[in-house]
């Protein structure tokens, strides 16, 4: 089985590096985007298995990126996990309203991150076999 490819979208390089190391240690491949525009391009060209999307980014928020990814026939099938430091039902509702598949609140442990990604991968695999 090929390594799952995860697109990490975050404007903080240190966060991208930490997440990338966690994913690598779990046998996953990571691809990085540091802004929303790059995320849209990379999602289309790389076809990741899951997108880990920070909500609070300059120029284009994660909400906008998620909405555009879900509107694009080439990327709408990719599960998106929104990452936010907002611990509110409003943040969760807004993520869902733009098409996110899951929400992960900061701070999170590497184990929580990997478990959430594995859940999304399992759901995708289940949908492909039915």
Show where each model-derived region lies:
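Charged docking surfaces used in two-component/phosphorelay signaling
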Residues: 17-25
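Receiver (REC) domain active-site loop signature in two-component systems and cognate sites
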Residues: 57
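C-terminal output helix
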Residues: 108-117
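Active-site beta3 strand of CheY-like receiver
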Residues: 46-52
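Short hydrophobic/Thr-rich beta-strand motif most characteristic of the beta2 strand and flanking loop
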Residues: 27-34, 42
């Amino acid at each position: 089985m090929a390594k799952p490819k995860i697109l990490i979208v975050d404007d903080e390089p240190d966060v991208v590096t930490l997440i990338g190391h966690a994913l690598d240690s779990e046998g996953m491949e990571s691809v990085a985007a540091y802004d929303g525009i790059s995320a849209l391009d990379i999602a289309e060209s790389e076809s990741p298995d899951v997108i880990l999307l920070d909500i609070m980014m300059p120029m284009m928020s994660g909400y906008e990126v998620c909405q555009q990814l879900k509107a694009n026939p080439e990327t709408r099938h990719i599960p998106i996990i929104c990452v936010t430091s907002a611990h509110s039902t409003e943040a969760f509702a807004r993520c869902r309203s733009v098409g996110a598949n899951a929400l992960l609140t900061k701070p999170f442990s590497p184990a929580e991150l990997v478990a959430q990604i594995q859940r999304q991968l399992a759901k995708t695999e289940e949908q492909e076999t039915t």
